[in-house]
Every structure is written in structure tokens, then in C-alpha cells.
Amino acid sequence: MGSDAKNLMSDGNVQIVKTGEVIGATQLTEGELIVEAGGRAENTVVTGAGWLKVATGGIAKCTQYGNNGTLSVSDGAIATDIVQSEGGAISLSTLATVNGRHPEGEFSVDQGYACGLLLENGGNLRVLEGHRAEKIILDQEGGLLVNGTTSAVVVDEGGELLVYPGGEASNCEINQGGVFMLAGKANDTLLADGTMNNLGGEDSDTIVENGAIYRLGTDGLQLYSSGKTQNLSVNVGGRAEVHAGTLENAVIQGGTVILLSPTSADENFVVEEDRAPVELTGSVALLDGASMIIGYGADLQQSTITVQQGGVLILDGSTVKGDSVTFSIGNINLNGGKLWLITGAATHVQLKVKRLRGEGAICLQTSAKEISPDFINVKGEVNGDIRVQITDASRQTLCNALKLQPDEDGIGATLQPA
């Protein structure tokens, strides 16, 4: 980074530019240069451990920063004609006034609107309530903190997007190594290989693919029961985990969705409101290569799950103690797909549905020593050609020449030879 600096600050000391003072042509490689209200700094070059701080009412013009140099612009301060190069960091809120350019293009913040910033190396932007930011790039250790609204944010490796309650984000892209923490609202998020945690917020039309991980209802320390995701798409290589909250409508194509068992006393988590319900509602489609694993006790009553050929739905009751286990669900459509029922040592298994129909297979995995004719039964409307296979815990087939035979009253089915 070139400079015609006349003043050199490299001793780690602090210099203050006071009201009415102007400092020009400064090379700042270590230490702090603070521009107070009414002060002015021009043609400052900030690198290394240098830090230019523009306080409220202060002005900086033609600042260059990079190579670990930092520019901080306080609320009500002004920094114009900035040049940001590789390794530079800028820290500010939407109450500052700045403009300049970086390797990716031009950027500005003015009157509560921010556009085009590149935030990296610890740089951050705070989007205040009622303000807006768009086309922000977050890279290594760059952060965007949103209490207002934001759109078209790209989060790359090491970057972090945080949307607080009351904040909103739209059309954001989270790439490999990027993180999105949501407590407000978000729509049309693309998780292209990053991580998103919904911490009691609401998101819709989120796409998860290519190694990305989406988590609803947890940050790894606490469960948040108030979270909700709608119209979730999980494509090849994507993974979604519902620890708490509600999943409404989903299409899974080649990806994996896991609904964990709800808990009120998990020693690994602090539980919001002493409860952590997990709820699945609306329409869920499991397409070729897709899998959905649902822990025991999740509320599935308002769901309709369609399992296409090559798709797998797993209801996991392996944690249930005792001789019987009951799986309750809304509607299941088997269009060539498989439904696995996982049990422990239970000797009686019941599947309660509003409606089970189509053509496909139910696979029952059990550790039970004996299998009786009434080992499994279904309560609810049953239609179609549904085969049944029973396996041991290692999924070695015990019996596969079985089918579900609807009862005469039409409100259930029992196990019969095929």
C-alpha cells in the first residue's frame, strides 16, 4: 500500500486530534489515532496494528487501510473517500456516514442505509432498528448484526450474520464456513454449504444443500421452543435438524431431516419455558434419496407425509421402555417409498394414523425375542398394497412375506401373510 506520509506512528502510543485540529499524511502502523468531535484526519494510511478511530462529530477523509489495519467510525462521525485493501477492517453502525471502495466494489453508509460493505478481519456493521443494509459481504471474522432489515448478504468462510428479535433478513447466501444465527425473521435463505441456527425466530423458503446444516431451536446450549420454519427445502448433501419448534411444509430431495425427541430435562441444554416441543405440520414430501428421521414423542398429528420411491421415513421408538410402543401420525402416503418403525424390545407395536394409503413397504426393526401374529396393528383408515418386513436390530430379515390387511370396519389393519 503506497503512501506519501509525513507523520509516522509506529510506537504503539495514542494520539488525539482535537476540535479544530487537522492532521494529514499519517502512516499508522501501530497505536491509535483518535479524531475527536471537530477534528479532522486526512490521507491516513492504516496497517499492521494501527487503529484509526473517528469519534462522533469527527471527520476522516481519504483514509487507506489494509493488512490488519482497522478503521472505526462512531455514530455521527464521517469518513469519506475510503480505500479498503486486503486484510483491512472497518467497524461502524448505520448511524455513521462513510463511502469508499474495496477490491469487490464501492460501498457507502448514509442516513441509515448501508450498501456494498466488505466486512472481514473483525470488521462489523450494526444495522439499527428502522435501518437497512444490503449487498454486504462477510468474510473471515466479519460480522453483520441486524436489528433492522438486510438483504442480499453473502456470508463466506469465517463470516457471521446475526439477526436479532425484530430484525429481518431476505435473499441471503451462506457459503462454506459461514454462519447465520437467527432470532428474528428470514426468508429465501440459501445455505450452500454453511450453517444456520434458528434460535426461536421464523424463517421461510430456506434451501439447504451441498453439505450445509440447518438447525431449528438450538444454539448447542439452549433449546428455543418458539422457533418455526416454513417451506423448507433440503437437497442433496443438505441436513436439517429440528431440536425444538415447528417445521411446516418441507420438500426433501436427496437430503436428510431429523426431528429429535422432545425433552423437558436434557442435562445438555437449558430449556426455554421448561419445555421443548417438536412439531411437524403441513405437507412433507420425501423424494428419491431423501430420508426423514423422527424421534419418539414429536407431534405429527397435523402432518401429511408422502414418501416417494427411493425415499425413507423413519419413526424411532427405540428409547421407549416396556412391552408396547405406539407411533401416532397424521397422514402417510406411500408412493413406492419405505416407512421404518424402530423399536426396542417391545412385543406389541401400534401405528395410529388418520390415513395410510398407497403402495410401499413398512419395515419394522425390533429386538423382541418373539413375534406374535398381533405383533403390529394399525389404527386408522388404510388403503392400498402395503407390504410388511420385520427385521432384527442389525436389520437382518426375520419375516418379509407379510402385508397389512384392512379391517372390515375400515378403521384399522392387521398383519397377514402376503
From Swiss-Prot:
Record-linked InterPro entries: AIDA, Autotransporter_pectin_lyase_C, Pectin_lyase_fold/virulence, Pertactin_central
Stated name of the protein: Uncharacterized protein YdhQ
Family annotation (NCBIfam families): O_hepto_targRPT (TIGR04415), PRK09945.1 (NF007409)
UniProt cross-references to Gene3D superfamilies, sorted A to Z: 2.160.20.20
Top-level lineage group: Bacteria
